[in-house]
Amino acid sequence: MARIAGINIPDHKHTVIALTSIYGIGIKRSQYICNATGIPQNTKLSTLSETQIDTLRDVITQFTIEGDLRREVTLNIKRLIDLGTYRGLRHRRSLPVRGQRTKTNARTRKGPRKPIKK
């Protein structure tokens, strides 16, 4: 297993798919990384040389990934809450933020139903 950005990348998968196991790298970004390094996308990670893996690491370090990205997202949500915006209010109340209906749906966000006491 190759270790990139503190994550063990699966060797048996193609490079494009294997890179998506890093938080913050999806299919499009992994395709960009493969094109930037000159590594074919359908090459298995186990067949890459150490120098190719080093070039992958160099390109990946240019992006905000893993813990830094998670921290950035949490700080953005915290900033919305502190500013008192409508989106921050929805985050604070654990309700859908992007305008979805809540009368019948949104069970994932709201949690299990609470029984009405009589």
From Swiss-Prot:
From the broadest rank down, the organism's phylogenetic lineage runs: Bacteria, Pseudomonadati, Pseudomonadota, Gammaproteobacteria, Candidatus Palibaumannia
Q: What GO molecular function terms would the record report?
A: rRNA binding; structural constituent of ribosome; tRNA binding
> Subunit info?
Part of the 30S ribosomal subunit. Forms a loose heterodimer with protein S19. Forms two bridges to the 50S subunit in the 70S ribosome.
Q: What does this protein do?
A: Located at the top of the head of the 30S subunit, it contacts several helices of the 16S rRNA. In the 70S ribosome it contacts the 23S rRNA (bridge B1a) and protein L5 of the 50S subunit (bridge B1b), connecting the 2 subunits; these bridges are implicated in subunit movement. Contacts the tRNAs in the A and P-sites.
Could you tell me which InterPro entries the record lists for this protein? Rbsml_uS13_C, Ribosomal_uS13, Ribosomal_uS13-like_H2TH, Ribosomal_uS13_bac-type, Ribosomal_uS13_CS
A single Gene Ontology CC term: cytosol
Region annotation (Disordered) maps to 92-118
Q: Which GO terms describe its biological process?
A: translation
Q: Which gene encodes it?
A: rpsM
Q: Which UniProt keywords apply?
A: Ribonucleoprotein, Ribosomal protein, RNA-binding, rRNA-binding, tRNA-binding
Q: Which family does it belong to?
A: Belongs to the universal ribosomal protein uS13 family.
PROSITE patterns on file: RIBOSOMAL_S13_1, RIBOSOMAL_S13_2
- The protein's name in its UniProt record: Small ribosomal subunit protein uS13
Q: Does the keyword rRNA-binding apply?
A: yes
Matching PANTHER family = 30S RIBOSOMAL PROTEIN S13/40S RIBOSOMAL PROTEIN S18, SMALL RIBOSOMAL SUBUNIT PROTEIN US13M
